[in-house]
UniProtKB/Swiss-Prot annotation:
The lineage of its organism: Bacteria, Bacillati, Bacillota, Clostridia, Eubacteriales. Promotes RNA polymerase assembly. Latches the N- and C-terminal regions of the beta' subunit thereby facilitating its interaction with the beta and alpha subunits. Its EC number is 2.7.7.6. The RNAP catalytic core consists of 2 alpha, 1 beta, 1 beta' and 1 omega subunit. When a sigma factor is associated with the core the holoenzyme is formed, which can initiate transcription. Belongs to the RNA polymerase subunit omega family. This is DNA-directed RNA polymerase subunit omega. GO terms for cellular component: DNA-directed RNA polymerase complex. The gene is rpoZ. PANTHER family: DNA-DIRECTED RNA POLYMERASE SUBUNIT OMEGA (PTHR34476:SF1). GO terms for molecular function: DNA binding; DNA-directed RNA polymerase activity. InterPro entries: DNA-dir_RNA_pol_omega, Pol_omega/Rpo6/RPB6, RPB6/omega-like_sf. Keywords: DNA-directed RNA polymerase, Nucleotidyltransferase, Transcription, Transferase.
Length: 66
């Protein structure tokens, strides 16, 4: 297995959000909230805000609203 693979995959995330632009906006805004002190909504092994945000999207905890 290639250790550089992103998990969850971009393809999986796009099925939840719709397009790459919305995915970037959603995850970056959520990561910024975490950086500014918001508590993560899921428990993950990573302390990186963007990784946490991506996993929250993958678990359908954070959703994109138009």
């Amino acid at each position: 297995m290639n250790n550089s693979m992103i998990n969850p995959s971009i393809v999986d995330l796009l099925t939840k959000v719709g397009d790459r632009y919305s995915l970037v906006i959603l995850t970056s805004k959520r990561a910024r909230e975490i950086i500014e002190g918001a508590e993560p909504l899921i428990k993950v092994d990573s302390h990186k805000p963007l990784t946490i945000a991506i996993n929250e999207v993958n678990e359908d905890i954070v959703k994109y609203e138009e």
